[in-house]
A protein has these predicted regions:
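All-beta strand scaffolds that present successive hydrophobic residues in beta-strands
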Residues: 18-21, 56-59, 96-105, 124-134, ...
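A generic "binding-loop/recognition-motif" signal
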Residues: 25, 112, 151, 163, ...
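Autoprocessing Asn-cyclization modules and mimics
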Residues: 49, 71, 75, 79-80, ...
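Right-handed parallel beta-helix
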Residues: 56-150
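Contiguous, function-dense segments enriched for cysteine-driven chemistry
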Residues: 185
Length: 236
């Protein structure tokens, strides 16, 4: 139904369950004041929704989460940031086994919140994936989507505004994004690191290569239109 719902967090959405709001302009979910369900963490700095296999969320706006703080030394690197105030994350007690959680036709609004955090380390089995369609993130100085440690996400028609980072993958996270945009924030799209558990595909590159040797240059610059030829390989 329409209305503003102030909730004790986190909320766990069971596998196969659909949450259907009356519309993003009429149904809003936000954290109630005080502490979260653990009795320690501020309610607006915990996770709003833990999602599970084949669950769906549609037709809501979300607001009020906060707590994200970027690293002072590497502000673009979310691995070094303080992550709080997440709207969507994997349920630590679940697994994505047949269908990804699907968040569509929703918006979130926050000062320092994180729209979605997908961390493969949370799950030992399953697909470790989420799917988003038309999930708009207005998280001032926060984060839109962060995919970590080989987790996977498809992000379609999702726009971020004023985020410190719009889309981020680290340590082998994977994003397939279509028809999206990151506007007015600090960093649009950031990728860093690799999956330490990934099996590499090794190969050789065939061909010649020119190596630049500083001590062998006789002119201060190359002339426009000049052809450069390797002294040994004769590659041009």
């Amino acid at each position: 139904d329409s209305g503003t719902y102030e909730e004790l967090l986190p909320i766990t959405i069971p596998a196969g369950v659909k949450l259907h709001g009356a519309g993003i302009r009429t149904t809003n979910v936000k954290p109630q004041a005080g502490l979260s369900a653990d009795g320690v963490t501020p309610n607006n700095e915990t996770t709003m929704f833990y999602v599970n296999n084949a669950c769906t969320v549609t037709g809501f706006s979300f607001s009020g989460m906060t707590g994200f703080t970027p690293s002072g030394s590497e502000p673009e690197n979310l691995e070094l940031a303080t992550i709080k105030g997440v709207f969507f994350a994997f349920d630590p007690n679940g697994a994505i086994t047949t269908k990804s959680p699907y968040i569509k036709d929703c918006s979130c609004f926050s000062e320092g919140g994180v729209g979605a955090f997908m961390d493969r380390q949370v799950h030992n089995t399953g697909n470790k994936s989420m799917v988003f369609h038309a999930f708009t993130n207005l998280n001032s100085n926060g984060v839109g989507f962060w995919v970590r440690y080989g987790a996977k996400s498809e992000i379609v028609s999702c726009f971020t505004y004023y985020c410190h980072v719009g889309y981020s993958t680290t340590t082998g996270g994977k994003i397939r994004a279509l028809n999206g945009n990151n506007s007015y924030g600090t960093y649009g799209v950031v990728s860093d690191g690799y999956d330490p558990n990934e099996n590499t595909v090794n190969g050789n590159v065939e061909g010649e290569m020119i190596e630049y040797a500083d001590d062998g240059v006789h002119q201060a610059y190359f002339a426009n239109g000049e052809t450069i030829t390797g002294g040994t390989s004769n590659a041009t």
